[in-house]
Each structure stands twice: as structure tokens, then as C-alpha cells.
């Protein structure tokens, strides 16, 4: 890879196991025991004229799925709100989290200041990553809430 050519990359990966012993002496997962986290970042900068740069960047992120506590449907229906089955705390494994972000930017060097226009396309694949689940008293079922889907973020930055 030619870093002087405006290329960069970074790869990181972490493996872990984070159980705990519950008050009933059972080893359980925590909500955040995702078992692994991996990131890949890369990008390329292209010089345009003497003082301008166009950059294209990519970020891939994944983690093992989160553990949730199952909802007790009968108890939830009787109470009219979400009641969790605490005897099964953090036993329900969700799908792995995945997100891909793309960023395109144009930077102008203006003597003592810099102007940058960029467009971040967050979760460009619109992957539906589970955030939480709750009881819905209207339907009598479980509603799944997801993390942010595709989200474009235009930015203007002037540094002086």
C-alpha cells in the first residue's frame, strides 16, 4: 500500500467473552457480550490541482449479536406492559450487527484556512440491526426496535 499516494487502511478485531454470575448462581451473558468486534477502514485521497483534495472513505463494522432477555408474553398481557422472563436473562441471541459507511469529501486549502464539503452515507446498506424488543399491548405481540437505518449526513466545515 502506498501511503504517500493517499491510501490508508486499518483493520482491527477483538474477541472477548463477558459472562457474569447471577444472584441465583447461574453463569449468564451480559447484554453487551457480543463475543467479537471487527472494523475495516480504508480510503484514498486524490489531489485536484495544487490545493484541493477529493477523498473517498469506507468503513465496515460488525459485532456478534447482542443478548436480550426474553419477554414473558402472558405476564406482559396481564400487566399491559413489558415483563421480562428474568429466569432466562440474556439468553436470546440476536443476529450479528453489521454496518457499512461511505464518505465522499472535497477539501480546499485556502491559505491559512481550509473548507471541506462532505457527504457521509451511514449504514449505506440499510441493515436492520436489532436494538431492543418490547411488548405491544395494542397487538398483544412483541415489537422489535431497530438501530438507525440508512442516514445521509451532509457536512460543511471551515477551519481557520
What are the language-model segments listed below?
Residues 3, 30-36, 90-98, 146-150:
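Short sequence motifs at beta-strands and strand-loop junctions characteristic
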Residues 84:
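Glycan-recognition and catalytic regions of carbohydrate-active enzymes
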Residues 33, 39, 45, 95, ...:
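Generic secretory/membrane-interface signal
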Residues 1-66:
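Gram-negative outer-membrane beta-barrel transporters
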Residues 60-81, 97-101, 106-160:
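C-terminal beta-signal and adjacent terminal beta-strands/loops
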Residues 14-15, 28-32, 75-77, 90-93, ...:
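N-terminal start-of-chain detector that recognizes signal peptides
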Residues 21-30, 87-91, 139-144:
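Extracellular loop and loop/strand-boundary signature of outer-membrane beta-barrel proteins
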Residues 35, 41, 87, 103, ...:
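Intrinsic disorder/low-complexity detector
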Amino acid at each position: 500500500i502506498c501511503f504517500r499516494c493517499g491510501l490508508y487502511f486499518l483493520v482491527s478485531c477483538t474477541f472477548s467473552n463477558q459472562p457474569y454470575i447471577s444472584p441465583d448462581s447461574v453463569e449468564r451473558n451480559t447484554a453487551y457480550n457480543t463475543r467479537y468486534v471487527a472494523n475495516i477502514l480504508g480510503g484514498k485521497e486524490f489531489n485536484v490541482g495544487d490545493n484541493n483534495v477529493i477523498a473517498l472513505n469506507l468503513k465496515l463494522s460488525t459485532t456478534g449479536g447482542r443478548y436480550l432477555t426474553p419477554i414473558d408474553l402472558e405476564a406482559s398481557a396481564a400487566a399491559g406492559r413489558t415483563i421480562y422472563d428474568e429466569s432466562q436473562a440474556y439468553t436470546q441471541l440476536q443476529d450479528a450487527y453489521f454496518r457499512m459507511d461511505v464518505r465522499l469529501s472535497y477539501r480546499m486549502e485556502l491559505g491559512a484556512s481550509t473548507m471541506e464539503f462532505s457527504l457521509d452515507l451511514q449504514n449505506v446498506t440499510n441493515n436492520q440491526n436489532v436494538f431492543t424488543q418490547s411488548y405491544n399491548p395494542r397487538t398483544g405481540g412483541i415489537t422489535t426496535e431497530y438501530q438507525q437505518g440508512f442516514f445521509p449526513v451532509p457536512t460543511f466545515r471551515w477551519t481557520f
